[in-house]
C-alpha cells in the first residue's frame, strides 16, 4: 500500500532541559524506564538523548494523525508513554508501541531517524503499510 503518514518534530534542547528540571514536573513520567535508563548511561548528554526521543514521540503522533486525515483525532491518554524508542546493539533506533496506539498501528512499519546538533534535536517518522 505504501506510505500512510509522515511526521517531523524539532525540539529546543535548552527549553526541553528547563522543562525537565522544573520542580514537581511530571514530564519525565512520559519516558519509559528503558528510555530513562538509556539516558542515564549517557550522563553528559542525557538531556540531548531524551530531547531526541521526545521528538520521536511527537513525530510518531504527527505521522499517525496525518494518516487519519479527515477523521476525528484520536489521542489516547498517556500516548507518549506508549511510544518507546529502543536501540539495537549498534545504536540504531526503532519505535516500539504499546497500548491503544499499538492496536491502531498493527500493520504499520515505522521508520525513524533522529539527530541532535547544537541546541536542536529532531526526528522524522514514516509510517508504511506493506
Swiss-Prot record:
Its main location: cytoplasm. Disulfide bonds: none annotated. One of its GO terms (cellular component) is cytoplasm. Its cofactor is Mg(2+). Its EC number is 2.7.8.7. It catalyses: apo-[ACP] + CoA = holo-[ACP] + adenosine 3',5'-bisphosphate + H(+). Signal peptide: none annotated. It is an enzyme of class 2 (transferase). Keywords: Cytoplasm, Fatty acid biosynthesis, Fatty acid metabolism, Lipid biosynthesis, Lipid metabolism, Magnesium, Metal-binding, Transferase. GO terms for biological process: fatty acid biosynthetic process. InterPro entries: 4-PPantetheinyl_Trfase_dom (IPR008278), 4-PPantetheinyl_Trfase_dom_sf (IPR037143), ACPS (IPR002582), Ppantetheine-prot_Trfase_dom (IPR004568). GO terms for molecular function: holo-[acyl-carrier-protein] synthase activity; magnesium ion binding. HAMAP family: AcpS. Belongs to the P-Pant transferase superfamily. AcpS family. This is Holo-[acyl-carrier-protein] synthase. It comes from Mycobacterium leprae (strain TN). The lineage of its organism: Bacteria, Bacillati, Actinomycetota, Actinomycetes, Mycobacteriales. The gene is acpS.
Amino acid at each position: 500500500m505504501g506510505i500512510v503518514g509522515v511526521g517531523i518534530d524539532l525540539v529546543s534542547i535548552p527549553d526541553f532541559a528547563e522543562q525537565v528540571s522544573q520542580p514537581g514536573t511530571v514530564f519525565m513520567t512520559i519516558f519509559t524506564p528503558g528510555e530513562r535508563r538509556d539516558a542515564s548511561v549517557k550522563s553528559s548528554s542525557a538531556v540531548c538523548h531524551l530531547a531526541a526521543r521526545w521528538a520521536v514521540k511527537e513525530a510518531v503522533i504527527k505521522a499517525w494523525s496525518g494518516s487519519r486525515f479527515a477523521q476525528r483525532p484520536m489521542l489516547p491518554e498517556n500516548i507518549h508513554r506508549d511510544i518507546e524508542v529502543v536501540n539495537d546493539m549498534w545504536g540504531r533506533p526503532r519505535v516500539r508501541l504499546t497500548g491503544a496506539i499499538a492496536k491502531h498501528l498493527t500493520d504499520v512499519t515505522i521508520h525513524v531517524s533522529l539527530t541532535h546538533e547544537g541546541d536542536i534535536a529532531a526526528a522524522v517518522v514514516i509510517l508504511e503499510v506493506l
